Amino acid sequence: MATQNAILKKALIIFLFTLTIMTGTAFSQNCGTNGCKGNMCCSRWGYCGTTKAYCGTGCQSGPCNSKPKPTPTPSGSGGLNAGPRGTIASVITPAFFNSIMSKVGSGCPAKGFYTRQAFIAAAESFAAYKGTVAKREIAAMLAQFSHESGSFCYKEEIARGRYCSPSTTYPCQPGKNYYGRGPIQITWNYNYGAAGKFLGLPLLKDPDMVARSPTVAFQCAMWFWNKNVRPVLSQGFGATTRRINGGECNGGRPAAVQSRVNHYLDFCKKLGVTPGTNLSC
């Protein structure tokens, strides 16, 4: 009898151990819904782990691997804050600015809207540009603005949606839409609200101000640039693209990435500066 009880006890232990393993496996196979604990990846098959098999192709969540981000480049070499500098007015000469705007087609809605005077006035309203600025940064800024606005053809997004996200800080105003406007195509109520707060302008109540005033349009674009893009200038032009539209990077939209690079190379050439390194993302 004692022997039989021992056998039953051992069988029960084995059963419970097996059940525990099966339960754990069931949870790990459901990580696409429940996620993984700690710094683990949820694989394409629903398992949690930390190796390439989990964090590589098909990874659903967690610190999934992508192509490695560019290693920060020292500001003294390939960064956008390196190289020749000058005041905004001396860098944005009439000839340089006109060489960009002269390519805007006659049928473009923003033909004649973006002016050199507006760009300089907007830049000088930011402390970062009151002294001298790297020519590479100006080339990069204008390259990104040019790409986002269709080579300065547009001041408003073609597909004009509502773009209202619930917010107690920057609530959407009745009848107002927060679609892309200006050279960076600033979008969503929370961006209009934050930009307006920084600039001292009622952009939540009057988002169309960005499309009416070229100075405000450039100010909003520069607000976004200073807040989100300027911190990565030392990493090269590719890092600015990642900050503006990271979905294009790592093979997402190679043609769009190259378009941005082409604008940048063109403007660097016109300003007489080398482009630095890490151009793509």
UniProtKB/Swiss-Prot annotation:
Q: Which residues form the Chitin-binding type-1 domain?
A: 29-66
Task: List, from the UniProt record, the residues annotated as the active site of this protein.
Answer: E148
Catalytic activities? Random endo-hydrolysis of N-acetyl-beta-D-glucosaminide (1->4)-beta-linkages in chitin and chitodextrins
Q: Which PROSITE patterns match?
A: CHIT_BIND_I_1, CHIT_BIND_I_2
Q: What is this protein called?
A: Endochitinase At2g43610
Query: Which InterPro entries does this chain map to?
Result: Chitin-bd_1 (IPR001002), Chitin-binding_1_CS (IPR018371), Endochitinase-like_sf (IPR036861), Glyco_hydro_19 (IPR016283), Glyco_hydro_19_cat (IPR000726), Lysozyme-like_dom_sf (IPR023346)
The alphabetized UniProt keywords are: Carbohydrate metabolism, Chitin degradation, Chitin-binding, Disulfide bond, Glycoprotein, Glycosidase, Hydrolase, Plant defense, Polysaccharide degradation, Signal
Signal peptide positions on this chain: 1-28
Which protein family is named in the record? Belongs to the glycosyl hydrolase 19 family. Chitinase class I subfamily.
Instruction: Name a biological process GO annotation.
Output: chitin catabolic process
- Please give the Gene3D superfamilies that the UniProt record associates with this protein: 1.10.530.10, Endochitinase, domain 2, Endochitinase-like
Q: Report the PANTHER family cross-referenced here.
A: CHITINASE FAMILY PROTEIN (PTHR22595:SF197), CHITINASE-RELATED (PTHR22595)
Q: Glycosylation positions? A: N278
Q: Which cysteines are joined by disulfide bonds?
A: C31-C42, C36-C48, C41-C55, C59-C64
Q: What class of enzyme is it?
A: hydrolase
CDD domains recorded: chitinase_GH19, ChtBD1
Start and end residues of each stretch annotated as Catalytic: 86-281
As recorded in UniProt, its EC number(s) are: 3.2.1.14
Gene Ontology CC terms, in alphabetical order: plasma membrane
- UniProt KW Oxidoreductase keyword: no
Q: Name one GO molecular function term.
A: chitin binding
